[in-house]
């Protein structure tokens, strides 16, 4: 009997496609308005994972033609210093997107800093104004990871209308905006989390299952409905018996691949899509600024 294997939702390939589209768009618009889009990434301290993420973002910016205004601050940087930097970036006409790399040192108020970013420069889509626009179904900058999930599902023409969707995780970064985006696409949405009773019975009903709890291997094959679409948002670094570290998601990929219809890998699934949508948000802000200034005549 032939063993069924789920089709891979290839985020890496789609992210490269999006980057090529953005590159062409930037070349065309820059010739008209005289400057490239700009993204400022603020990092505080020396968290190795954060440093790697920032390098990846800056590399991706360079690839598509976005100017990077990266700022790296020492661990002891004060709240006021960062607030002053954000205030200046809000006024800087060369900067279209601002991102505060999380996590921040404990003495800093991350929420207050995120709220200070001008909503139209909120590259991460986490400002209350942009989240409010999402709730209302209005246009606005969307949270990058869930927006990346939606773009990936659309690329593979996976219909969401009327489907049962379960999101495991309720963070403001992924879980909550993910549920809202699925709802906006006419799915029937359930949010589960670490306090949910009988998680298995909830996930087994999902036509679309999004794992975003940050717990390696949380979702196993017996928790998945046969033929479901399984999206793994988790990025967890684990160490094996030989002391080697590797990235894994929130699902048991090997076993679930024999049950699901579609599945995302880690790495190579949602991670590249998150970066691609960050670039997309920056370019969206860039185009909007150009239109408002009259430098770009777009219908």
Curated annotation (Swiss-Prot):
NAD as UniProt keyword: no
GO cellular component: cytosol
Entry EC no(s): 1.5.1.5, 3.5.4.9
Disulfide links within the chain: none
UniProt keyword Transit peptide, yes or no: no
Pfam family, one: THF_DHG_CYH
Role: Catalyzes the oxidation of 5,10-methylenetetrahydrofolate to 5,10-methenyltetrahydrofolate and then the hydrolysis of 5,10-methenyltetrahydrofolate to 10-formyltetrahydrofolate.
Family: Belongs to the tetrahydrofolate dehydrogenase/cyclohydrolase family.
Assembly mode: Homodimer.
Protein name in UniProt: Bifunctional protein FolD
Originating species: Trichormus variabilis (strain ATCC 29413 / PCC 7937)
Lineage, uppermost ranks: Bacteria, Bacillati, Cyanobacteriota, Cyanophyceae, Nostocales
């Amino acid at each position: 009997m032939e063993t069924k294997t789920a089709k891979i939702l290839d985020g890496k390939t789609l992210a490269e496609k999006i980057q090529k589209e953005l590159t062409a768009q930037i070349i065309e618009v820059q010739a008209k308005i005289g400057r490239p889009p700009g993204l400022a990434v603020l990092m505080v301290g020396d968290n190795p994972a954060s440093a790697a993420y920032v390098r990846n973002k800056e590399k991706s910016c360079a690839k598509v033609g976005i100017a990077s205004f990266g700022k790296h601050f020492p661990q002891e940087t004060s709240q006021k210093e960062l607030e002053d930097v954000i205030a200046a970036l809000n006024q800087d006409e060369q900067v279209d997107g601002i991102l505060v790399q999380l996590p921040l040192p404990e003495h800093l108020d991350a929420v207050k800093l995120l709220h200070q970013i001008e909503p139209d420069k909120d590259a991460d889509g986490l400002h209350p104004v942009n989240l409010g626009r999402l709730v209302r179904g209005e246009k606005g900058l969307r949270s990058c990871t869930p927006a990346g999930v939606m773009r990936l599902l659309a690329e593979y023409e996976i219909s969401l209308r009327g489907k049962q969707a379960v999101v495991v995780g309720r963070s403001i970064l992924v879980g909550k905006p993910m549920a809202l985006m699925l709802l906006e696409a006419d799915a029937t949405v359930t949010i589960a989390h670490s306090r949910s009773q009988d998680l298995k019975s909830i996930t087994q009903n999902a036509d679309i299952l999004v794992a975003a709890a940050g717990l390696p291997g949380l979702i196993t094959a017996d928790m998945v409905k046969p033929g479901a679409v399984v999206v793994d948002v988790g990025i967890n670094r684990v160490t094996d018996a030989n002391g080697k570290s590797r990235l894994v998601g929130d699902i048991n990929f090997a076993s679930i691949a024999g049950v699901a219809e579609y599945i995302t890998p880690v790495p190579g699934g949602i991670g590249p899509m998150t970066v691609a949508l960050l670039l997309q948000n920056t370019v969206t802000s860039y185009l909007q600024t150009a239109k408002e200034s009259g430098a770009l005549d777009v219908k």
